[in-house]
Amino acid sequence: MPRAAPNSINATLNLSSSLGKTVHLPAPAATIFVADPTIADYQAPSNRTIFVFGKKFGRTSLFALDENGEALAELHVVVTQPIADLRAMLRDQVGDYPIHVSYTPRGAILSGTAPNAEVVDIAKRVTEQFLGDGAPIVNNIKVAGSLQVNLSVRVAEVSRSGLKALGINLSAFGQFGNFKVGVLNRGAGLGSATGSGGTAEIGFDNDAVSVGAVLDALAKEHIASVLAEPNLTAMSGETASFLAGGEFPIPVLQENGQTSVEFRRFGVSLEFVPTVLDNNLINIHVKPEVSELSLQGAVQVNGIAVPAVSTRRADTVVELASGQSFVIGGLIRRNVNNDISAFPWLGRIPILGALFRSSSFQKEESELVILVTPYIVRPGSNPNQMSAPTDRMAPALGTPPRARAAISTDAPSVKGDLGFIIE
């Protein structure tokens, strides 16, 4: 740090972008430099006058030294955008909502209340574009009503060979990457794989066809297996995640020759980010994944067998109303088995044994079907309305027959329309 000259200037210089101020030095300057010329710069009409102007949002420092190396001026330059212009732009883009913006030496602060998360996101993006890349923004805008989204997910493994045997076709009209997305039209049913009738297509459900009921029926016939049924609730705009599985160790060879252990996750995982839009529409970024340990591709590390991981995942963004469903499918796994049938003892005779044995290849295909249903929910204000499934059950075992006959309780039932509590 250079030694300060007599009557040196040490101050904070506040500038707006594309505007400047004049600084008069107490003595002629021999050297002038700016720490970050991309934020602010200068022009010197004379050796005692500096014109400092802002270029973009940020903070930097300006130093002016005399011929002896002593500091004539040490300025902390803070460059901001005209806050009145930003406030006017916010009103034009998001409407007349109580959203406030203020500047700090390090960035901008957004505060106030918005009707939904979409307005919050627009206000943040407008501020970022106005201030420029890299400008720190603190978002303190609150969403009115504390909207939350409950995501009901069913992850099922469906046997494709069983579906073909029953003449069921789970098809879709559109394919994106390795998974398919379609629409369940009103009146559509389960058609054959080759027929031209209605099919249970992978996509949105408009209450005419319940894919969940189809999965239940297939599970009873051992054609489908439900792997997980997570229910997650998250604030609008926040991230929620779920994992049903475990972790397995992986030996990792270090540079010094020693071996450390890292753990990798496997199983059924889900991550989603819901955003509540206008008219109760929900924008969902959902990333389901199913992974399992596999001997195919396994390796040996220092004599330790490390299994491979077979992974099927999808990543998509959709918009739908509360209570509607969509399905992700097309994630297929294939297994090929070679079955050998032979007559006892005779099948082992050289050359002639081939006449007494036969081999057949069996190809098994299974499809991963992920059913997702979002609901807009709010916290319950009355805890007495919340109950567990066993709250209305009365024990019958361990009581005398007469007392058992006297037990009376109301049959369990759901509360509210469709099982939801309406306040």
UniProtKB/Swiss-Prot annotation:
GO CC annotations, alphabetized: type II protein secretion system complex
Domain (BON): residue spans on this chain: 75-145
InterPro entries: Bact_Secretion_Sys_Channel, BON_dom, GspD/PilQ, T2SS-T3SS_pil_N, T2SS/T3SS_dom, Transpt-assoc_nodulatn_dom_bac
Pfam families: Secretin, T2SS-T3SS_pil_N
Signal peptide start-end: none
Keyword Transmembrane carried by entry: no
GO biological process: protein secretion
SMART domains listed in its UniProt record: BON
Keywords: Plasmid, Transport
Family: Belongs to the bacterial secretin family.
Role description: Involved in the secretion of an unknown compound.
Protein name per UniProt: Uncharacterized protein y4xJ
Gene source species: Sinorhizobium fredii (strain NBRC 101917 / NGR234)
